[in-house]
Amino acid sequence: MPGRSCVALVLLAAAVSCAVAQHAPPWTEDCRKSTYPPSGPTYRGAVPWYTINLDLPPYKRWHELMLDKAPVLKVIVNSLKNMINTFVPSGKIMQVVDEKLPGLLGNFPGPFEEEMKGIAAVTDIPLGEIISFNIFYELFTICTSIVAEDKKGHLIHGRNMDFGVFLGWNINNDTWVITEQLKPLTVNLDFQRNNKTVFKASSFAGYVGMLTGFKPGLFSLTLNERFSINGGYLGILEWILGKKDVMWIGFLTRTVLENSTSYEEAKNLLTKTKILAPAYFILGGNQSGEGCVITRDRKESLDVYELDAKQGRWYVVQTNYDRWKHPFFLDDRRTPAKMCLNRTSQENISFETMYDVLSTKPVLNKLTVYTTLIDVTKGQFETYLRDCPDPCIGW
């Protein structure tokens, strides 16, 4: 009990510190300028490209990529196992993962289960652990997404992928363990059919859903987690118990990227499809006004907040809180993002200035794995690994 009390006091102290720090220098800063093209201490490096051939059988599609990334995937899978075993030292949870999760196959939609089987085979990681690795992303995605329209009606979509909160803190270098281990797993993917691009995405090797992507010339899509009491854990439990009329959110976003042929079709599917976990879908199109944040409960859409430049709404910003509510006081990335967009102005929004906004603390923080910039009309899709050197807020 004394140990637990000590942990509680440490967490309380950290929370109070973050509450104060997030709104005061040096953990926040004036809006950054001239950070693009990426360089300097907040730039970790470029993200490699791989082609995923959709003409191959699903079992074989990921083999080339996973041969390269198997060693780093094993590192993060082992880290997650160690964290679980720390809380449940008996090892029974991992025993259930390894023995029971593969029995759920036959219940996943489309090609996803064959793809996961193929990844397990080529990496020599138990199939149950590959499945749990894919479930993992339904629960811990903490992000900032923005769609902005310039004075000419041109759209730019930007996002920071923040991931790994409370999943192990490295006291030696002040970083989140899982966040750092995800960086070498980050890949750009060119999904092709008949040697032609169907869509492009940034993802983590071993994950067959999609969190960030675009269909050149048509639309862009990012996914943010939505915290809710009626949340992902409940949805996963219901799914395990046999309720199969819902879609995994990462599988839905991939299905939309792969099959939808217009902004409106994508919006319709993202608005109406029953999903496993609450989420925000941030969607951008190819013409003026085509940008929105879809706030989803598991069964229905609660809100579709759209661009309306004529009414002065030339951007939409989404973090992980409903737009009509105040962000959690320990985690307000929305306010600084909006402040920097307003200072940038519609006249000056561009790839360069969008990167500036996403490089400003605390929009950029210790959880940030990568930043993506998308221009649907020009076919530009750029992803950069990020660092947030001290002093930098933990989230």
Swiss-Prot record:
It catalyses: an N-acylsphing-4-enine + H2O = sphing-4-enine + a fatty acid; a beta-D-glucosyl-(1<->1')-N-acylsphing-4-enine + H2O = beta-D-glucosyl-(1<->1)-sphing-4-enine + a fatty acid; a globoside Gb3Cer + H2O = a lysoGb3 + a fatty acid; a globoside Gb3Cer (d18:1(4E)) + H2O = a lysoGb3(d18:1(4E)) + a fatty acid. The record marks 162, 320, 333 as: Important for catalytic activity. Glycans are attached at residues 173, 195, 259, 286, 342, 348. Changing residue 97 to E: In FRBRL; decreased ceramide catabolic process. Optimum pH is 3.8-5.0 for the hydrolysis of N-dodecanoylsphing-4-enine. Optimum pH is 5.5-6.5 for the synthesis of N-dodecanoylsphing-4-enine. Activated by Ca(2+), Mg(2+) and Na(+) cations. Inhibited by Zn(2+). Phosphatidylserine and phosphatidic acid stimulate while cardiolipin, phosphatidylcholine, lysophosphatidylcholine, phosphatidylethanolamine, phosphatidylinositol and sphingomyelin inhibit the reverse ceramide synthase activity. Phosphatidic acid, phosphatidylinositol and C16-ceramide inhibit the ceramidase/hydrolase activity. It is found in: Lysosome; Secreted. Changing residue 80 to Q: No effect on autocatalytic processing, but loss of ceramidase activity. Changing residue 152 to N: In SMAPME; decreased protein abundance; alters the splicing of ASAH1 transcripts. Disulfide bonds join 31-340, 388-392. Changing residue 259 to Q: Loss of ceramide catabolic process. Pfam families: CBAH (PF02275), NAAA-beta (PF15508). GO terms for molecular function: fatty acid amide hydrolase activity; hydrolase activity, acting on carbon-nitrogen (but not peptide) bonds, in linear amides; N-acylsphingosine amidohydrolase activity; nuclear receptor binding; transcription corepressor activity. One of its GO terms (biological process) is regulation of programmed necrotic cell death. Changing residue 169 to R: In FRBRL; uncertain significance. Changing residue 176 to Q: Moderately decreased autocatalytic processing, but loss of ceramidase activity. Its main location: other. Changing residue 195 to Q: No effect on ceramide catabolic process. It is linked to Farber lipogranulomatosis: An autosomal recessive lysosomal storage disorder characterized by subcutaneous lipid-loaded nodules, excruciating pain in the joints and extremities, and marked accumulation of ceramide in lysosomes. Disease severity is variable. The most severe disease subtype is a rare neonatal form with death occurring before 1 year of age. This is Acid ceramidase. It comes from Homo sapiens.
